[in-house]
């Protein structure tokens, strides 16, 4: 995903951009005119006239324009995104390709935070909570972000119980980033409401091999936790 080109992004975004009501006639005209006036020209005068022809439907003209840009090369696709940002910024911020890039960067950061033993920021915690793909908890209890965890977890058996109670959500990032075997499964400790995974087979029954999960605190007790 980090090697994704502007042409790749345009292929991914085309179904979204050509959806009903996404771009208005005026916005498409402005984008075409900007690409026509760009030096050296992205669109020739003849091409600009073709893509602005009111005899064809807006969707057909837009599909033809995007197909033309994809064939033209990376620079032309990049300038299209620049024009789209200028003339349709709210739509630009919702592009599927931008969402995919944000997911990659933030999950990559989450993996680095966990690998180094640090703790993520509050925005990162909120994002990880929203991206939950697996749930291992008892239903009907409090939200994981509703109350702050104890500043220092107790030690001994009570600490084991507190740590087990700290688990609510399992957020998998294995879909976005391959991880080293040392992070494929493990035991954990908690700090600031975040559960950090360490390489250890004792927790493999809860965390599948080949994926990394981040656990956010709550009062929920998963039945699989600490089972040996």
Swiss-Prot record:
GO terms for biological process: negative regulation of canonical NF-kappaB signal transduction. InterPro entries: CARD19 (IPR043574), CARD_BinCARD (IPR042146), DEATH-like_dom_sf (IPR011029). Keywords: Disulfide bond, Endoplasmic reticulum, Membrane, Mitochondrion, Nucleus, Phosphoprotein, Transmembrane, Transmembrane helix. GO terms for cellular component: cytosol; endoplasmic reticulum membrane; mitochondrial membrane; mitochondrion; nucleus. GO terms for molecular function: CARD domain binding. The keyword Ribonucleoprotein does not apply. Disulfide bonds join 7-77. Expressed in ovary, testis, placenta, skeletal muscle, kidney, lung, heart and liver (at protein level). Expressed in thymus and brain. It comes from the Eukaryota. The keyword Transferase does not apply. Residues 8-99 form the CARD domain. Plays a role in inhibiting the effects of BCL10-induced activation of NF-kappa-B. May inhibit the phosphorylation of BCL10 in a CARD-dependent manner. Associates with BCL10 by CARD-CARD interaction. PANTHER family: CASPASE RECRUITMENT DOMAIN-CONTAINING PROTEIN 19 (PTHR34765:SF1). This is Caspase recruitment domain-containing protein 19. It comes from Homo sapiens. The gene is CARD19.
